[in-house]
Structures are given as structure tokens and as C-alpha cells.
């Protein structure tokens, strides 16, 4: 027993409320955005932050009630706000530190803390916890208080194996996304340099041509004409090479962008689509551009 819950109950509750949180997220954003999106951090239908949030509240309530004290709805509401918000804050901070991105952003909400949490959603957390404790948990406990059979443990173990695999795959996908963003940023930087050089060369050629028209009245010699022709030919060659290089870089940029945005069911495109307010610490502009491509 841990905080009044058996190991089986802890495993079961975490799965149930992770799935329940995912359902709530999908429904909420379907209503808000008008389209159904897999809102989970993982590929499967789970949101771990909800599982951890609800379990933390259950652990505290069981500990307090185990000492003989009763919890009022107001106390449950307050504890729900504090604990669930703390879980959301830690989760948001860890994801930011590990993957250099803020997956949700409350910066536009009043009374927010660094965009990780805000008063509005903390209050929603509190109300949701009261509903879970007073309504839903009664039905869940009715199926979880018995001694689990061997087959039930096997099912739980299989589900957690899938959960762990999904987590490993998702981490690999995000690491791959960050590597591609680094490459995209390098290609975009090179593209700007080449485009600037091309613009400068074209401008120099135009000015040079105007100057040579005036010089032709004074320097009417064959040697000067040949020199001008050679210089013009060299510039044309440079311009053509810069145009080819720019086209190659543009093709690379499009290919890399497509390799991200084409995978919207499972993959890097799904991650960006699932978190429309995601802010990347290093490549914010690129993320915004990729979001536009996914609309």
C-alpha cells in the first residue's frame, strides 16, 4: 500500500485518468478550434500530466483521511488547484529544459507564471478534481477494490509496455525534430547569404553597365571593350552560379520542411499540430512557419 492505494490501484488509476485527460483535451480543442486533434504529448490516447495530477491528489486525500480527518469540498478544491497546478508547472518546465520547447503557453492569459501555468486553468483544475473525487472515482473504485487476478496484471503490464514504447518513440521523434530544425535554420541562413550576394551582384552589374556607357565615349579602344566583355561574362557566370545555389538551397529547405509536415498522424508534424501554442526556445520562427504549412 502507498498512500492508501495498492500497487494495482495506482497503476490502474494512472492509466484511466491519463486516458480521461486525453479525452477532455481532444473534446475541449475540438470545440475551441473546430477540428479533432490528437492532443497528447505521446502518440497514444493518453496525457500523463492528468494521471500524475489526479494521483497526487488521491495520495494526499487518502493520507489526510487516513488520519481520521474528513475533507470538505472546499478543501478538495484548494488541494486540487495546488497539486494539479504544481504537476503542470513541473511538467512544463521539464519539457522545456529537456526539449528546448514550451509545449503549452499561457503567456496571453492573466496571472500566468512564465507561461507554464495560469489562474484560469488552475481554477479549472480545482473544479475537475472535485468532480473526479465526488463522482467518477466512486465508479472507478467499484472495479478496483478487489484483489486483481493474474490476467489483470498481465493486461496492465502489456498496457504499460505500450506506454513505455510510445514514450521512447516520442522522445526519439522530438530529438529528430530538433535536429531537423537545426538543419533548416542552417539552410535558411545560407539561403539568405546567397540571396544577398545575388542581389549585390545584380546591383553592381547594373551600376557598372551605366558607368561603362559613359566611359565608352572616352575609352573607345578595343582593349577596353574586350576587358569590359570579359568582366561582364564573369559577372554573368557568378550570377548564374548564385542562382543555381539558391535554387538548391530552396529545394533543401522544402524537402526538410515536407519531411516534418507530412507526418501528421504519427511523427514530427503531429507534435507541432498537437500543440498549436508551442514555443521553441531556439527556433521560434521556424516553428511558426511550419505551423502555417500544417493549417
Predicted feature locations:
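Aromatic-rich, lipid-facing transmembrane alpha helices and their immediate juxtamembrane interface loops
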Residues: 1-295
Amino acid at each position: 500500500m502507498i498512500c492508501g492505494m495498492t500497487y494495482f490501484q495506482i497503476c490502474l488509476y494512472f492509466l484511466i485518468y491519463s486516458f480521461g485527460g486525453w479525452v477532455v483535451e481532444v473534446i475541449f480543442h475540438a470545440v475551441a478550434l473546430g477540428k479533432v486533434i490528437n492532443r497528447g504529448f505521446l502518440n497514444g490516447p493518453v496525457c500523463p500530466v492528468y494521471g500524475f495530477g489526479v494521483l497526487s491528489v488521491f495520495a494526499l486525500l487518502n493520507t489526510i483521511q487516513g488520519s481520521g480527518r474528513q475533507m470538505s469540498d472546499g478543501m478538495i478544491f484548494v488541494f486540487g488547484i495546488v497539486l494539479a497546478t504544481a504537476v503542470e508547472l513541473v511538467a512544463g518546465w521539464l519539457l522545456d529544459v529537456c526539449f528546448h520547447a514550451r509545449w503549452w503557453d499561457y503567456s496571453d492569459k492573466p496571472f500566468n507564471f512564465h507561461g507554464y501555468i495560469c489562474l484560469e486553468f488552475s481554477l479549472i483544475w480545482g473544479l475537475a478534481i472535485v468532480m473526479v473525487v465526488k463522482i467518477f472515482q466512486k465508479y472507478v473504485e467499484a472495479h478496483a477494490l478487489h484483489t486483481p487476478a493474474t490476467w489483470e496484471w498481465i493486461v496492465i503490464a502489456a498496457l504499460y509496455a505500450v506506454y513505455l514504447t510510445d514514450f521512447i518513440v516520442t522522445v526519439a521523434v522530438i530529438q529528430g525534430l530538433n535536429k531537423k530544425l537545426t538543419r533548416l535554420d542552417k539552410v535558411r541562413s545560407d539561403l539568405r547569404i546567397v540571396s544577398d550576394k545575388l542581389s549585390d551582384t545584380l546591383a553592381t552589374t547594373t551600376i557598372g553597365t551605366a558607368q561603362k556607357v559613359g566611359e565608352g565615349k572616352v575609352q573607345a579602344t578595343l582593349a577596353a571593350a574586350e576587358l569590359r566583355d570579359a568582366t561582364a561574362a564573369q559577372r554573368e557566370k557568378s550570377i548564374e552560379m548564385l542562382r543555381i545555389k539558391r535554387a538548391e538551397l530552396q529545394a533543401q529547405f522544402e524537402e526538410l520542411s515536407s519531411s516534418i509536415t507530412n507526418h501528421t498522424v504519427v511523427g514530427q508534424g503531429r507534435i507541432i499540430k498537437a500543440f498549436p501554442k508551442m514555443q521553441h526556445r531556439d527556433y521560434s520562427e521556424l516553428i511558426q512557419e511550419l505551423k502555417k504549412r500544417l493549417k
